[in-house]
């Protein structure tokens, strides 16, 4: 999924546009090239370097988020933003008068992008020393923590939207709505802080994770003879799949540069990534049913049948409300993947997962 949609390319574009707004003397393409080179160099130096850099970025992001929430809370006490009445607090979370099923599912198709990182953890399974169970625990914890933080951040931002009606009607094509709420809450300095922090997080931290996880996926598939063998080459010094890292970097750079020249580049790329995630998760849920219920006759029907079926139904509902262009390209990519799978079966290179038993 991530290989087909190149989330790093979108991260480069979003970060470059944000930094160009802050430092206009450097063009968008210059920022894209700079972010691509920096993240590639860091990843080439190995997973320890990548983990160290992302850890520092995580600390910085949490400090900025804490600053935003703290300043926002103080601004509410001073009377800026919405009045903290019971109705206001409730409407900031959910407004029954304006919420429809199509609106919710359409929003979910975009919001999925914010949570794709948690499944990227699984790409580093071979470099984890704690076993498969630790990978699953890490994914669940990451999803719950980021979800809680996102809810808190979004709730606070909702209370500082200057013109909610216009925002709902026109959307946010420039991607500045959150920074506008920071300006209302704390002034230009808070808007600049959140904008630069977001841009650097996208351009470096998020891109690092996208690049490293996608390169590991390419490496594993090449090692299992499902992709060209050169992608399985590992650097003897740094123990990284060097060719896979460089290929992902090149494709992400190209995609970022192409989309930067489109007025709807960010929106289109977001839709493509999200629809790719949706279809990928549909296939994943289907695989769970096939592996446990059909192949191994599992009796744990709630875990291995009902839960995946519910997930498939919800994901299909979200996909129906996705961008039309994203639907077409996403289905085309899914069809291409199915074709590749047929070729692999026909040539005796059937995909397999080492260590998979009948139960989980």
Q: Language-model segments: which ranges?
A:
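Helix-loop-helix connectors at the membrane interface of multi-pass transporters/channels
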Residues: 1-27, 59, 64-67, 125-132, ...
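TM-loop-TM module centered on a large, flexible mid-protein loop between adjacent transmembrane helices
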Residues: 1-10, 90-94, 138-208, 227-273
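C-terminal membrane-solvent junction of multi-pass transporters and transport-like membrane proteins
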Residues: 24-27, 39, 231-238, 278-328
């Amino acid at each position: 999924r991530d290989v087909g949609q190149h989330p790093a390319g979108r991260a480069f574009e979003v970060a470059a546009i944000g930094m160009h707004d802050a430092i206009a003397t450097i063009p968008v393409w210059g920022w894209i090239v700079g972010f691509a080179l920096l993240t590639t160099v860091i990843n080439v130096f190995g997973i320890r370097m990548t983990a160290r850099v992302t850890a520092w970025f995580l600390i910085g992001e949490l400090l900025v988020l804490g600053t935003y929430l703290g300043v926002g809370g103080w601004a509410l006490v001073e009377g800026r933003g919405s009045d903290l009445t019971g109705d206001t607090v409730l409407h900031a979370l959910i407004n029954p008068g304006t919420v429809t099923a199509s609106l919710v599912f359409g929003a979910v198709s975009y919001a999925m992008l914010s949570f794709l990182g948690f499944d990227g953890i699984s790409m580093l399974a071979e470099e984890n020393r704690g076993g498969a169970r630790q990978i699953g625990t890490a994914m669940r914890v990451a999803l719950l923590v980021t979800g809680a933080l996102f809810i808190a951040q979004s709730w606070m931002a909702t209370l500082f939207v200057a013109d909610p009606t216009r925002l709902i009607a026109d959307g946010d094509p420039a991607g500045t709505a959150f920074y506008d709420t920071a300006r209302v809450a704390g002034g230009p300095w808070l808007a600049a802080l959140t904008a630069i922090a977001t841009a650097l997080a996208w351009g470096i931290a998020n891109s690092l994770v996208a690049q490293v996880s996608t390169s590991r996926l390419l490496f594993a598939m090449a090692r299992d003879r499902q992709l060209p063998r050169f992608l399985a080459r590992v650097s003897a010094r740094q123990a990284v799949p060097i060719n896979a890292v460089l290929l992902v970097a090149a494709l992400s750079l190209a995609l970022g540069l192409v989309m930067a020249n489109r007025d709807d580049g960010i929106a289109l790329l977001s839709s493509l990534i999200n629809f790719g995630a949706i279809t990928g998760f549909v296939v994943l849920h289907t695989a769970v049913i096939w592996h446990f219920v059909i192949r191994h006759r599992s009796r744990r029907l709630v875990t291995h049948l009902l839960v995946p079926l519910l997930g498939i139904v919800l994901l299909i509902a979200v996909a129906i409300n996705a961008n039309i262009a994203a639907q077409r390209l996403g289905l085309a990519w899914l069809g291409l993947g199915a074709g590749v799978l047929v070729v692999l079966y026909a040539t005796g290179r059937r995909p397999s997962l080492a260590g998979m038993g009948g139960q989980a």
